[in-house]
């Protein structure tokens, strides 16, 4: 573990204002206001990104997506974390092993890229590994879902995630790939009508 991370004061100073709100480029210190701006701004950027039909080939693309979604708000957007991360009782991949996690995901993406269509379990596997990797301070779920949605588009598919994140988060925290697969739906991408 990075020695500095053991010092929670270091962590607070790096990421948080004194009231506990994430430090941000807009200097918003009200957590509710920040959350509202973050969700709206990241959502608009996500839609814009999907319309560009980018090819997904590695975790490098996830870093770019995270930077697009959150770079307007956070200095650390798109940067792989260099510290240990625990949320509640969930521990994510140790920082010292992050490169191994990235390699595993990249290898799976390369393996799946040659397939015409992917199954729910293929996306569930990647979603599980991305969740455990948890490469960023915040925004991991949204950027991972966008990353996989773009990867699905590369295969002429669309992923429908459940309306409520609760069951999906539980399945991810339990690393239950079968449960994750049962919660997502993979459909053929609708073709645009010719005018």
Model features per residue range: what roles?
Residues 1-195:
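FIC/Doc superfamily catalytic core
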């Amino acid at each position: 573990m990075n020695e500095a991370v053991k010092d929670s004061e270091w962590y607070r100073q790096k990421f948080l204002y004194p009231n506990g709100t994430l430090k941000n480029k807009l200097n918003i210190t009200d957590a509710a206001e920040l959350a509202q701006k973050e969700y709206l701004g990241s959502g608009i950027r996500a839609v814009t990104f999907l319309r560009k039909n980018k090819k997904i080939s590695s975790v490098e693309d996830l870093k770019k997506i995270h930077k697009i979604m959150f770079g307007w708000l956070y200095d650390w957007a798109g940067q792989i974390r260099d510290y240990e991360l625990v949320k509640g009782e969930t521990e994510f991949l140790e920082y010292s092993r992050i490169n191994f996690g990235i390699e595993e995901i990249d290898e799976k993406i390369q393996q799946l890229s040659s397939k015409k269509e992917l199954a729910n379990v293929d996306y569930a596997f990647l979603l599980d590994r991305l969740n455990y990797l948890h490469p960023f301070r915040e925004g991991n779920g949204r950027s991972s879902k966008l990353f996989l949605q773009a990867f699905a588009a590369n295969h002429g598919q669309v992923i429908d995630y459940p309306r409520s994140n609760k069951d999906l988060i539980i399945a991810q925290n339990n690393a239950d790939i079968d449960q994750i697969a049962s919660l997502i739906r993979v459909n053929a991408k609708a073709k645009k009508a010719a005018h």
